Amino acid sequence: MSESIDRVFVKAIGTIRTLSSRTGYGGLPRPPIENRVKLYGLYKQATEGDVAGVMERPLGDSPEAEAAKRKWDAWRSEQGTSKTEAKRQYISYLIDTMKQFASDTTEARELLSELEYLWNQISDVSPNDSSDSESNAGPAQLLQNHAQLLSRDISVVDDPITSSGMDPMYNPSFQRHNSSRFINASTAERLNSLSNYYSNLNPTPPLSSRRYQGSVTPRNVDFIKWQNDINNSINKLNHDLQLLANRRLQSSASDPLYSKRGSDLTHDDFVNDISSSSSNRRFRARRNQPLVSKVLLGTISLLLKLIKTVIKHVAIDAVIIAVLVAVIKRSIIIPNLISNEISLQKIHHSELESNSSIKGDSNGGRLTIVLPFINGKDFFQENSLLGKLLKVFHDYVDHVSRIRLIKRN
């Protein structure tokens, strides 16, 4: 019976690790801290026994010390409970907790139904029967049974062909998971050697001498067959769970954010508060933004850069245009120098008439240089840029004519 309890207990440990790997990012809520601490105390009592003599109560006022005290008190509350009874309570309490807090997803319901089915097969059997049979058995028989149980556990976990179809050394986290199980292969070999030693000291009588002692009956044979069927079913379930765990570990091996998942999670991780889960969820939400949002953000950023560049070039062009306008105005506006008629000094009428079209002015003998394309105010506006340029050109021609006349005179 103890062997069956151990098998279901191993299944419960695998179930809680699977649930822990789904908590925080798959929508599966964590149970309250009281439930987790209770499970922690039962787990420590089932695997290590009483806390007295193992460790002292932690001291300190820090949050870590308070959490350690809470876990130590939960372990201490199970003082005096046998390991087998602690395993039974652990399985039963885990099933009740899963019914309340881990029944929202299909995977969680499947895990719960599998664990509950296995538990119903052995929950009605009294633990006293198993304890009595163990107390009557010799040390060699106890060690042999325990070694067989552990060897069977190791064969399910460590067989690279039946568990994953590949070398488990390929994934470091898978290797840590195998080494962090309850016992390793070397310990099982030592237990086998101890059982052989006790068998040599107290050899077991042959089956013929025990045939009439009432130890083997049809009822016991049926029970053993039923127990073997249960063990085979559990082995198959563990094999399937290991395959699923290997797939998850292989898919998350290249992702540093989720490198600590699945079988890497311990009971301490399960008990600790999820203080950093909210920041992790925000980070994952940013990572998992839809493609449309990313494209929209990229387009907006490009538009902002384009607008900034256009404004910069427009400002530079405006400054250049302002400087050019100022230079043109300063070079064009010449007050009191532009006029349509220029009075000249009295010169010789014949020379001027030969060089240019000069008409005599009867008013005081003054002469006027006539440029028809400049004289017409109706043709060009005085304030226009072209009109001002033509006036400047007219003044220049008048100035050159004066110089030539002065030299000739």
UniProtKB/Swiss-Prot annotation:
Subcellular location: Peroxisome membrane
Any one GO biological process: fatty acid metabolic process
Induction (record text): Repressed in glucose and ethanol media, but induced under peroxisome proliferation conditions in methanol and oleate media.
Alphabetized Pfam families for the sequence: ACBP
Transmembrane parts of this sequence: 314-334
Family under the similarity heading: Belongs to the ATG37 family.
Protein's name according to its UniProt entry: Autophagy-related protein 37
Species annotation: Komagataella phaffii (strain GS115 / ATCC 20864) (Yeast)
